[in-house]
Design a protein with these regions (language model features):
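N-terminal accessory nucleic-acid engagement/regulatory domains that precede
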Residues: 1-88
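Pre-P-loop entry segment of helicase/translocase ATPase cores
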Residues: 67-127
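Post-DEXD/H (motif II) to motif III coupling segment of the RecA-like Helicase ATP-binding lobe
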Residues: 70, 237-238, 243-283
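Walker A/P-loop
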Residues: 122, 126, 136-161
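Conserved Walker A/P-loop ATP-binding site and its immediately adjacent core
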Residues: 148-187, 252, 275
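Short, conserved loop/helix-junction motifs that constitute active-site signature segments
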Residues: 162, 223-236, 256-263
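Conserved nucleotide-binding/hydrolysis micro-motifs of P-loop NTPases
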Residues: 174-176, 199-200, 211-214, 245-246, ...
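Inter-Walker segment of RecA-like/P-loop motor cores
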Residues: 184-226
């Protein structure tokens, strides 16, 4: 039986060493998915692309969330992992399940000016279920319908994860930045936003769009911004992505797999789980 070495480089990326090219090619094929609309794209028409998206490189690189597929392919090809080099930063996550009275127990009430001013903030049963599912799975995705109080859910998750570092909440547009910020303020959290002309730094929790992070990165690289993306993300241990199905966008994918690759807590919320296999695998 052949052998190989598995390197877990961070919370997202893996590399496998010692495989012959045939096995690497089989892994790449097992984690390659067709793009249904590829035939309409110029690269496909010109014969420069096979119309598929690959999640395992022929050089032996892949992703942690595909390890089950990797192990299955290796077993079929009589290859054993004899050495595991886990380079992830060691952290012991310990979460206590929440109840509907989570914020009430913190002494938090709806603030002045809110329609429920002076009343205790009580979580709804489906919010409690969603939060506890996330706490049981620190790297996971859940389908949560629009209008189900996602901002209170994310505020609760951010507060619970405070002992482990900063949280970064990525939303798809500016209006959701402001909506999310409002509930974080209602819950008494130390929150800032980063978009447009509002760029608040040094906060425990930051709400932004992925477009704003991309602009920051580009401006620093061309010398027009003093702050680098790495400096902006320093201390972030929790990433919460709203409408995570948009993570298939290349910019957001790069942020999550490169700049934020060491964050141990990674939660995604979406109202729409992608139906296409290649889109689902990308998140």
């Amino acid at each position: 039986m052949a052998s190989c070495k598995l390197i877990i480089e961070d919370e997202v990326n893996i590399k496998i060493e010692g495989l012959d090219v045939d096995v690497r090619r089989k892994l790449a094929n097992a984690l390659k998915f067709e793009v249904p609309y590829a035939r309409y794209m110029p690269q496909y028409k010109l014969g420069r692309w096979d119309g598929k998206v690959a999640f395992f490189g022929i050089g032996g690189t892949g992703y942690v969330n595909h390890l089950d597929v990797v192990q299955e392919v290796l077993a079929k090809n009589r290859v054993q992992i004899v050495d595991i080099d886990d380079r992830r930063h060691p952290i012991q996550l310990d979460f206590t399940p929440v109840t509907e009275n989570y914020w009430k127990d913190q002494g938090v009430q709806w603030p002045e000016g809110h329609p429920a001013e002076g009343e205790d903030i009580i979580l709804r049963d489906y919010q409690v279920d969603a939060i506890n599912n996330f706490l049981n799975n620190p790297q996971s995705l859940q389908q949560i319908a629009t209008g189900a109080g996602k901002t209170i859910t994310t505020a609760t998750l951010s507060h619970i994860s405070e002992p482990y570092g900063r949280s970064l909440v990525i939303v798809p547009n500016k209006s959701l930045v402001e909506q999310t910020e409002e509930d974080y303020i209602n819950c008494g959290l130390d929150v800032g936003v980063y978009f447009g002309d509002r760029k608040q730094l040094g906060k425990t929790h930051t709400i932004c769009t992925w477009q704003s992070l991309n602009i920051l990165d580009k401006k620093h690289k061309d010398g027009s911004a003093v702050l680098s993306l790495a400096e902006f993300l320093e201390g972030v241990s929790t990433i919460i992505v709203d409408e995570v199905h948009q993570a298939k966008a290349e910019v957001l994918k790069n942020l999550l797999t490169r700049n934020l690759r060491n964050a141990p807590i990674r939660w995604g919320l979406t109202g729409t789980v992608p139906k296409e296999k290649f889109e689902f695998e990308s998140i």
